[in-house]
Curated annotation (Swiss-Prot):
'HIGH' region (motif): residue ranges: 42-52
Designated name of the protein: Leucine--tRNA ligase
Alphabetic keyword roster: Aminoacyl-tRNA synthetase, ATP-binding, Cytoplasm, Ligase, Nucleotide-binding, Protein biosynthesis
Family matches, as Gene3D superfamilies: 3.10.20.590, HUPs, Isoleucyl-tRNA Synthetase, Domain 1
InterPro entries: aa-tRNA-synth_I_CS, aa-tRNA-synth_Ia, Leu-tRNA-ligase, Leu_tRNA-synth_edit, M/V/L/I-tRNA-synth_anticd-bd, Methionyl/Leucyl_tRNA_Synth, Rossmann-like_a/b/a_fold, tRNAsynth_Ia_anticodon-bd
GO cellular component, one term: cytosol
Motif ('KMSKS' region): 581-585
Natural source organism: Geotalea daltonii (strain DSM 22248 / JCM 15807 / FRC-32)
Main location: cytoplasm
UniProt cross-references to HAMAP family, sorted A to Z: Leu_tRNA_synth_B
SUPFAM superfamilies in UniProt: Anticodon-binding domain of a subclass of class I aminoacyl-tRNA synthetases, Nucleotidylyl transferase, ValRS/IleRS/LeuRS editing domain
Length: 824
């Protein structure tokens, strides 16, 4: 064994061995418990950052720990490789997106290997590889056949800078999640997935995921947004059709005084009279420049315009003016809102602004509302008034009775509505998965026959930065023949949202080389579900929801038998420096390469795991990195100095140990239990590492030289330190394990066994209080009775002096912890 710890030499040695031996290759093993550990795969941006280091270090600890516990571990890695940054880089560097992407993958793969992460690299996949995306095209065709994929014209979120459509989930505070440009509204024909068909199941199954953070589940439940209410028809004056409204507040129907339509509502222009057309068109132009999320914000100014038309309240026969309102969306309900200004705050503000009539229909119990003096809407329960036969009822009771009344009279029906909208997947970008559809003037939209897949992304695209989709300019790609009639036809030039690729990659990892379809059912049945998934909470209502949806779709298509993809979910915190998230723009980035070069990968791993619990943000500290490096050097020195003494020692005889030996062994086994629990049950790696550090301190203070019978426990302690450190600092631990004379690698070694008998305390340290104030500590035998302990406390010299001459009223003993003497 070398006297000095040289990280570069140690890490290069073990990385080569792991690579050549395929040490982490996962195979299906019947009869062995499997464990599928997965971190969200990265976009190949060019370099890994400290967020990657932390995320993947967390996962690697769990993977290595589970291997040592005897599990058959699957721990794969791949690349979420399609996406707009590759096109932007192509323009900037005058390089093809494929070249840029694959060069980045090669570099980042090397970085990950230098970190010592225990991936099965034989399962590596890149979503931009045709061998991956061709199966996604087949899944699309099967979804199309089942009616789960469709195309229609709709109002979409449009990023003018990226020149592509964004899903609602990709709009953050009115801006594009990728480039921060203000999002606009645009009418486009686009492909969508019918995720709403699975809304009920997606919602119900959130209650079957006890291993997920409640915060994520709540975010998904709110996004799905199930609400029960009524669908009511309001006839339109002078027309035979009606406006359908969904409401959860049918108890306020008698107070509806006007109708608010979404500007995008199909009846918006039809209901606009000639004298109102100019002002309505101006209003519509203004709304198109405002994104939908901003329009629904509470503090957003409510604006509208009168169409000139009226509808009829079905229960009061009131003539209700029809307005277009900027806060109403077609994305929720029917795109029409029966406005009840006295009992809805948005309607109240709107009615006050445009001088629209109001009617109170719910009074607070024991109170009275007057429209003339109201300063805000009354939205709580109360007593029904001005509501015909329902007057005097509690509004909650009336809500149910009015729903029944509407159904009986044929005026409406009870229904369930979801906030969740179908997932628009069309993107006007080149670097994505081509949608396998052909357009024929005679036959319409025709699916590409499965035998003709894949539709390969052409490599001869030109990237000028002038905007638009490069695919739409490649005649050799666009021009084709109709599969049905053989006439000239053209290909779809939209590509799929990159969230489609990340919605099933975890399944493909189970069978990355399967050539007969998207999934090998036997292998997916063995490995799925993912036992532990790790990634950021920012994916709660995008990737994590889409992945759940896709898993259910693939189940229904017969590819797998699971309902949920991820049994347990850990959402790790960010890495921050100088009070904010690391970013190039803020100049607070720490380069992992520089860190590895100076300290080694194991120090980088150790610090990222020790500095904070995984679910919390990690505050970067250069001093903390130095401290982690010093600790590893201390352990190295300890093993080096102990090696001559322990290398030839015999088996451990617990009965022969001195008191000092028993004390050390007790600490060893308490530490084994704590580290095991902290990794397995809590993922509190920071407290696990702290416990190992305390154990190292105890070993350093241990002096066995004059007591040969204690040498075996020193060996047990030193080997336990190495084994316990193995998941955290694997290169370091492998080198020490080999130096200790072991021929097996640590990924083949067993986790140290906990000996409960060895961990039992022979003595207890009892805290002593007098009238609740700390006055001392007393050591007693662990086997002492309650009365023995009380007697020992009263016999203690210091305590005896404190209570001398006082009247002892009672003695309270908290078993194993403290004695409180109450005196008067």
């Amino acid at each position: 064994m070398e006297e000095k710890y040289v990280p570069a030499r140690v890490e290069e040695k073990w990385q080569k061995l792991w690579d050549s031996n395929k040490s982490f290759k996962a195979e299906k093993v019947e009869g062995k418990s499997k464990y599928y550990l997965l971190e969200m795969f990265p976009y190949p941006s060019g370099r890994i950052h400290m967020g990657h280091v932390r995320n993947y270090s967390i996962g690697d600890v769990i993977a290595r720990f589970k291997r040592m516990k005897g599990f058959n571990v699957l721990h794969p890695m791949g690349w979420d490789a399609f996406g707009m940054p590759a096109e932007n880089a192509a323009i900037q560097h005058k390089s093809h997106p494929a070249k840029w992407t694959y060069e980045n993958i090669d570099y980042m793969r090397g970085q990950l290997k230098k970190m010592g992460f225990s991936y099965d690299w034989d399962r590596e996949l890149a979503t931009c590889n045709v061998e991956y995306y061709k199966w996604e095209q087949l899944i699309f065709l099967q979804m199309l056949e089942k009616g789960l994929a469709y195309k229609k014209k709709s109002s979409v979120n449009w990023c003018p800078r990226c020149e592509t459509v964004l899903a609602n989930e990709q709009v953050e505070d009115g801006s594009c999640w990728r480039c921060d440009s203000l999002v606009e509204q645009k009418e486009l024909e686009q492909w969508s997935f019918r995720i709403t068909d699975y809304a009920e199941e997606l919602l119900e199954d959130t209650y079957k995921l006890p291993g997920w953070p409640e915060r994520v589940l709540t975010m998904q439940r709110n996004w799905i947004g199930r609400s029960t209410g009524c669908e009511i028809d309001f006839s339109i004056e002078g027309r035979k059709d009606a406006i359908k409204v969904f409401t959860t507040r049918q108890d306020t129907l008698f107070g509806a005084t006007f109708m608010s339509l979404a500007p995008e509502h199909p009846l918006a222009l039809q209901l606009t009279t000639a004298e109102n057309m100019i002002v309505v068109n101006a209003f519509l132009d203004k709304v198109k420049k405002t994104d939908k999320i901003k329009r629904t914000a509470e503090d957003f100014e409510k604006e509208g315009v009168f169409t000139g038309s009226y509808c009829i309240n079905p229960v009061t026969n009131r003539r209700m003016p029809i307005y277009l309102a900027n806060f109403v969306l077609t994305d929720y309900g029917t795109g029409a809102v029966m406005a009840v200004p006295t009992h809805d705050q948005r309607d109240f503000e709107f009615a006050r602004k445009y001088a629209i009539a109001m009617e109170v229909v719910i009074q607070p119990e024991g109170g009275s509302l007057d429209v003339a003096t109201m300063t805000e809407a009354y939205t709580a329960e109360g007593i029904m008034v001005n509501s015909g036969r329902f007057d005097g009822l509690n509004s909650a009771v009336a809500k149910e009775q009015i729903a029944d009344f509407l159904e009986q009279e044929g005026l409406g029906k009870k229904t369930v509505n979801f906030r969740l909208r179908d997932w628009g997947i069309s993107r006007q970008r080149y670097w994505g998965n081509p949608i396998p559809v052909i357009y024929c003037d005679d036959c319409g939209a025709v699916p590409v026959p499965a035998k003709d897949l894949p539709v390969v992304l052409p490599m001869d695209a030109t990237f000028t930065g002038e905007g638009g989709n490069p695919l739409s300019k490649i005649d050799s790609f666009i021009k084709t023949t109709c599969p049905l009639c053989g006439k000239d036809a053209r290909r779809e030039t939209d590509t799929m949202d990159t969230f489609v690729e990340s919605s099933w990659y975890f399944l493909r990892y189970c069978c990355p080389d399967f050539a007969c379809g998207p999934l090998d059912k036997g292998k997916t049945e063995y490995w799925m579900s993912v036992d532990q998934y790790i990634g950021g909470i920012e994916h709660a209502v995008m990737h994590l929801l889409y992945a759940r949806f896709f898993t259910k779709v693939l189940r229904d298509l017969g590819y797998c038998d699971i309902n949920e993809p991820f049994t347990n979910l850990l959402t790790q915190g960010m890495v921050i420096k100088d009070g904010s998230k690391m970013s190039k723009s803020k100049g607070n980035v720490v380069d992992p390469n520089a860190l590895i070069e100076k300290y080694g990968a194991d120090t980088a791993r150790l610090f990222s795991l020790f500095a904070a619990p995984p679910e919390k943000d990690l505050d970067w500290s250069d001093q903390g990195v130095d401290g982690s490096y010093r600790f590893l050097n201390r352990v190295w020195k300890l093993v080096y100095e102990c090696l001559p003494l322990i290398s030839a020692t015999g088996p451990l005889d617990a009965a022969a140990l001195t008191d000092e030996g028993k004390t050390l062994r007790r600490l060893v086994h308490k530490t084994i239990r704590k580290v095991s629990d902290d990794i397995e049950d809590r993922f509190h790696f920071n407290t696990a590492i702290a416990a190992i550090m305390e154990m190292v301190n105890a070993i350093q203070a241990f002096e066995p030289k004059n007591q040969p019978r204690n040498v075996p426990v020193l060996k047990e302690a030193v080997e336990s330190v190495v084994l316990l450190l193995a998941p955290f600092v694997p290169h370091f631990a492998e080198e020490l394990w080999e130096s200790l004379g072991h021929e097996d690698n640590l990924n083949e070694a067993a986790w140290p066994a906990f000996d409960a008998a060895a961990a039992v305390d022979e003595e207890l340290l009892v805290v002593v209080q007098v009238n609740g104030k700390l006055r001392g500590k007393v050591t007693v035998a662990a086997s002492a009775t309650d009365e023995d302990i009380k007697g020992a406390v009263l016999a203690d010299e210091k305590i005896r002096q404190l209570i001398d001459g006082m009247n002892i009223k009672k003695i309270v003993y908290v078993p194993g912890k403290l004695v409180n003497i109450v005196v008067g």
